[in-house]
Structures are given as C-alpha cells and as structure tokens.
Swiss-Prot record:
<comment type="similarity">
    <text>Belongs to the cytochrome c oxidase subunit 3 family.</text>
</comment>
<feature type="transmembrane region" description="Helical">
    <location>
        <begin position="163"/>
        <end position="183"/>
    </location>
</feature>
<feature type="transmembrane region" description="Helical">
    <location>
        <begin position="201"/>
        <end position="221"/>
    </location>
</feature>
<dbReference type="GO" id="GO:0005743">
    <property type="term" value="C:mitochondrial inner membrane"/>
</dbReference>
<dbReference type="InterPro" id="IPR013833">
    <property type="entry name" value="Cyt_c_oxidase_su3_a-hlx"/>
</dbReference>
<dbReference type="GO" id="GO:0006123">
    <property type="term" value="P:mitochondrial electron transport, cytochrome c to oxygen"/>
</dbReference>
<dbReference type="Pfam" id="PF00510">
    <property type="entry name" value="COX3"/>
</dbReference>
<keyword id="KW-1278">Translocase</keyword>
<dbReference type="InterPro" id="IPR033945">
    <property type="entry name" value="Cyt_c_oxase_su3_dom"/>
</dbReference>
<keyword id="KW-0812">Transmembrane</keyword>
<feature type="transmembrane region" description="Helical">
    <location>
        <begin position="240"/>
        <end position="260"/>
    </location>
</feature>
<keyword id="KW-0999">Mitochondrion inner membrane</keyword>
<keyword id="KW-0496">Mitochondrion</keyword>
<dbReference type="GO" id="GO:0004129">
    <property type="term" value="F:cytochrome-c oxidase activity"/>
</dbReference>
<comment type="function">
    <text>Component of the cytochrome c oxidase, the last enzyme in the mitochondrial electron transport chain which drives oxidative phosphorylation. The respiratory chain contains 3 multisubunit complexes succinate dehydrogenase (complex II, CII), ubiquinol-cytochrome c oxidoreductase (cytochrome b-c1 complex, complex III, CIII) and cytochrome c oxidase (complex IV, CIV), that cooperate to transfer electrons derived from NADH and succinate to molecular oxygen, creating an electrochemical gradient over the inner membrane that drives transmembrane transport and the ATP synthase.</text>
</comment>
<dbReference type="InterPro" id="IPR000298">
    <property type="entry name" value="Cyt_c_oxidase-like_su3"/>
</dbReference>
<protein>
    <recommendedName>
        <fullName>Cytochrome c oxidase subunit 3</fullName>
        <ecNumber>7.1.1.9</ecNumber>
    </recommendedName>
</protein>
Amino acid sequence: MSTHSNHPFHLVDYSPWPLTGAIGAMTTVSGMVKWFHQYDISLFLLGNIITILTVYQWWRDVSREGTYQGLHTYAVTIGLRWGMILFILSEVLFFVSFFWAFFHSSLSPAIELGASWPPMGIISFNPFQIPLLNTAILLASGVTVTWAHHSLMESNHSQTTQGLFFTVLLGIYFTILQAYEYIEAPFTIADSVYGSTFYMATGFHGVHVLIGTTFLLVCLLRHLNNHFSKNHHFGFEAAAWYWHFVDVVWLFLYITIYWWGG
C-alpha cells in the first residue's frame, strides 16, 4: 500500500472499485427507469449484481487495510468519521426531497385528486397494524445495536455477538413485513401522486434497511473473527450510526405518511 507509518495520512493504492461502482449505479438507475416503463428488468438486475460485487470487494479491501495492515491510524479514523457524518447528512437531504414532495401534494390536494388526501379511490394502510409493528421492531433494533456497542466498549464478546445478532434478525423481520405489506397493498406506485410518494419514500427506506442489515451482518462476522476491539471498531460504529439514522427516518415516515397522511 501507499501509506507508510512515517505519516498519518490516508493514501491508498489505485483501485477499480470507484469506477465499477459508478458503472453499477448508472446501470441500476437506468434499468430501474426502463423497468418502470414496462421494459425488461434484466438491466436493473445486472446493475444490482455489479453494485453488490463492487461493494463486497471494496469493503473487503477497507477491512484488510484497517485490520491487517494497520493503515487506519487515529488521523485516518477522524477522516473516516467525518466522511460518514457527511454521507448521513447527504442521506438526510435525500429523504427531505421525498417528504417535500409528500407535503407539497398533501397539504393542498389538486382538484384532479378530488381535493382530498388520500385521493379519492385510494384505500390507505391502517397505521396501527403492520406499520406500528414495524415501528416497534425498528425501535427495538435501535436498543439492541446500542446494547452491542456498549458491550463492545466493555470488551464483552458474547453480549456484543448477541446484540448484533438480534439487530440483524430484527432488520430481516422488518424487511419481510414490509414486503408482505407491499404484496397486499390495495394501490400501486402508478396510483396518483399518493402511490408515487408512498412507494418512493417507503421503498427507498426499505433499501436503506437492507443496506444497514447487510452492514451489521458484516460487522457481526468481523466481530466473530475478532476484528474489533474497544479502542478500534469504527466499522461497527459507522454501522450503528447508519442504523440509528434509518430508525429516525422511519419514525418520520410513520408519523407523516402512514398516520397523518393516511
């Protein structure tokens, strides 16, 4: 690697993963647009495969740099922390756009929607059934990931394992319930602006839950291989930050779109 012990800066070798990641993202988005317009889904699936393979190999390299090569010095870790903070901030603004679209349409419904919200003919979800259960699941997962973090800080290996395991399990449970809700939904993404804003907001949140669950599963596997210590575990810390962000976004989704907007 390019980084040596005589300076703290984060210099890495040339890597193909930013390029393949950009290609994967472009292919995924292009394929999704074509899929939404009744074209074949194959381009979307190809983009997903490229992105998943890129993420796997990129994270593998980062784990090797930090765990086996000692490249994640204190100064490097500070840079990684700021990078994660700015990434989460960008994600906040990403979801603000969906809430903006929702409130723009719901606070003053157009005459084409029957001047009502939800629009005429739309049967919305009961917020006190599956959505409320999903809220409880995500709040519980926030507790378990915090339990795992505190256990790691106390060098309690078994309780860290249990906390991470239950968090991953709750994330999978949430995803299954969300998929069931979509399957049983009485409206589609094409059913007015209500369907569009509902599925875009909850769908992208669901994607973030899948990413967060994968992130935490990787942390669980790394923990089982003794990659973390109480003084060196930023990979886990970043996953916990991301998971708490997903929790908070869901609370806003539940209160605004499911409860107030339904």
